[in-house]
Regions:
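Core catalytic region of metal-dependent phosphoesterases/phosphodiesterases
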Residues: 1-64
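Conserved beta-sheet core of the metallophosphoesterase superfamily
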Residues: 50-58, 63-81, 89-194
Length: 197
């Protein structure tokens, strides 16, 4: 699938999830953190300052926010840099794709490079927990949570030496008084196929 077609499919899926949550969730407010990564990059090499200007993902998030601009229960937070900081209750959470963390497939997995990167970032701006994807590995290392792969094992996962994992995403609960209280998996390989109405 081409990047443009992938963005259109992702928009369709995200619009469906948002509509489902609005119609069935009885939520007063839904906060949507949006971080771009390497998947939608239009340049061969990553850019630092101008990364959002060349990101199909960043464009998609802005199109979604525009599409839902009249829905007062939705609040989009779209990163203009590789990281986005948002408070959950009084806990500062760092959201990022994760592709800016160097990892060469070492024995300790992503844990050691991620802990090192977080320690460096926390010197400038501390976060209670960092949420990341990119590495196709569902992991909870205390002050960071890595999301699994929505589609499961694939060629990229093999290239980065990721262990086989079923298609899944992380589900995290943060308690107002106790902080992170639960991390569990939402398995995505049994979901019904997407159909157009």
């Amino acid at each position: 699938m081409s990047p443009v077609k992938a963005i259109l499919l992702a928009m369709d899926l995200l619009n469906g999830v948002i509509k489902h949550l609005l119609d069935n969730g009885n939520f007063e407010r839904i906060t949507v953190p949006c971080c771009f990564g390497n998947h939608g990059r239009l340049t061969h090499k990553p850019r630092a300052k101008t990364a959002p200007d060349t990101s199909l993902e960043w464009m998609m998030y802005n199109l979604l926010a525009t599409h839902w601009k009249h829905e007062k229960r939705l609040v989009f937070h779209i990163a203009d840099a590789v990281q986005l900081y948002l408070p959950v209750f009084e806990y500062p959470i760092r959201f990022m794709h994760g592709d800016d963390v160097s990892y060469g497939g070492g024995v300790g997995g992503i844990t050691i490079p991620m802990r090192r990167a977080i320690a460096d970032w926390d010197k400038t701006k501390r976060a209670y927990c960092s949420m990341f994807g990119h590495f196709h590995t569902a992991v909870d290392i205390g002050n960071a949570i890595g999301n699994g792969s929505l589609i499961g094992a694939n060629a990229y996962g093999v290239r980065i030496h990721a262990a086989y994992e079923p298609p899944r995403q992380q589900f995290v609960l943060i308690d107002q008084k106790r902080g992170k209280s639960s991390v569990s998996h939402i398995y995505t390989d049994y979901l019904p196929p997407v159909t157009k109405e």
